Amino acid sequence: MFTINAEVRNEQGKGASRRLRTANKFPAIIYGGNEAPLAVALDHDKVMNMQVKAEFYSEVLTIVVDGKEIKVKAQDVQRHPYKPKLLHIDFVRA
């Protein structure tokens, strides 16, 4: 099982996302269920190492946000066209 630590994002938009990426993080969103969508920032290197395994896309993952565990599945992944970088991930609540 994969566990990912995340921070809540207060800023959104192109500039905020670029600042995250230069800080070795990237934006993600958690949606679905009866709760409101939650914008989070994830550590790029940790998630990059996890997503190499096929189980990352098929199993239920745990994202820890402010000490609260959220069970999710990876729904959509956006990658850089030619660099080995993740740009954004959509997670749906499990």
Swiss-Prot record:
<protein>
    <recommendedName>
        <fullName>Large ribosomal subunit protein bL25</fullName>
    </recommendedName>
</protein>
<comment type="similarity">
    <text>Belongs to the bacterial ribosomal protein bL25 family.</text>
</comment>
<dbReference type="InterPro" id="IPR011035">
    <property type="entry name" value="Ribosomal_bL25/Gln-tRNA_synth"/>
</dbReference>
<dbReference type="GO" id="GO:0008097">
    <property type="term" value="F:5S rRNA binding"/>
</dbReference>
<keyword id="KW-0689">Ribosomal protein</keyword>
<keyword id="KW-0699">rRNA-binding</keyword>
<dbReference type="GO" id="GO:0006412">
    <property type="term" value="P:translation"/>
</dbReference>
<dbReference type="GO" id="GO:0022625">
    <property type="term" value="C:cytosolic large ribosomal subunit"/>
</dbReference>
<dbReference type="Pfam" id="PF01386">
    <property type="entry name" value="Ribosomal_L25p"/>
</dbReference>
<dbReference type="GO" id="GO:0003735">
    <property type="term" value="F:structural constituent of ribosome"/>
</dbReference>
<keyword id="KW-0687">Ribonucleoprotein</keyword>
<comment type="function">
    <text>This is one of the proteins that binds to the 5S RNA in the ribosome where it forms part of the central protuberance.</text>
</comment>
<dbReference type="InterPro" id="IPR029751">
    <property type="entry name" value="Ribosomal_L25_dom"/>
</dbReference>
<keyword id="KW-0694">RNA-binding</keyword>
<dbReference type="InterPro" id="IPR020056">
    <property type="entry name" value="Rbsml_bL25/Gln-tRNA_synth_N"/>
</dbReference>
<dbReference type="InterPro" id="IPR020930">
    <property type="entry name" value="Ribosomal_uL5_bac-type"/>
</dbReference>
<comment type="subunit">
    <text>Part of the 50S ribosomal subunit; part of the 5S rRNA/L5/L18/L25 subcomplex. Contacts the 5S rRNA. Binds to the 5S rRNA independently of L5 and L18.</text>
</comment>
<dbReference type="InterPro" id="IPR020055">
    <property type="entry name" value="Ribosomal_bL25_short"/>
</dbReference>
